[in-house]
Amino acid sequence: MPLLAGDSHRALDTPNVYYQNHVSCPEFDVVGLSFPGMPAFPHFGHNPWVAWCVTHLGADYQDLYIEQFKKDDSGYYKYKDQWRRAEVYQETIKVKGGDDVPLKVWVTQHGPVISGNPEQGSGIAFKYTATEGPSTWPDGLWQMLLAKNSDELIESMREWVDPCNNLVFVDTDGNFGHLCRGKVPIRSKANGWLPVPGWTGEHEWQGYIPFEDMPKAVNPEEGYIVTCNNRPVGNDYPYYISTDFTPGFRAQRVTKRLLSLERP
């Protein structure tokens, strides 16, 4: 029977971000760590058949686009050889004990402008997988609670969006595995270094890495899986995931200790 061991290696928080609890009902029976106010057990948990834990994948799924605006309040910004009109919203920020603060929000095809001044000709727009459409992670968490084996657990993560994690799991059938879960956009690796020009069309997202192509290992012949926020794929992996994985020394140390163990 495979053994699963994981730790959150989070900073010491008061109050702790995790809440250990046991939820039992006719539909499921799960023990794990949840976030107060959040349903289910996205990071650490087990039911009678499957157990899981996570580390941070470090995937890059947010981009910044430099936008060129007309120097007026018309809201037009340049894209290729066209001028497109941004959505403009007038918001009011309520300040306790102070005056209201008016805020004009500009949204281009790449997302809301978070820096700069469009009325003076430029701004930086923020594009993020979790705001590209309705969030579907609650559906995945529900299916996670009901999983009877590793295959069902993997399938429950098909619509997981954010955050991207290394999900490690075992089941009572003797299977164990690792899945990189979450939506990672397909686009130029240049998007991962600096804000990119929004007007050229060269840095647009081309969908997401297919779920079947996300890094995954089930019952690897080595007989073990180690993940410590380190790079999960080799240089031959065809998609860009990140340029900012954690150095691999922790994973190397854990692997060395595992290989030094002798079976009783």
Describe the role of every protein-language-model region.
Residues 1-264:
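Mature extracytoplasmic enzyme cores
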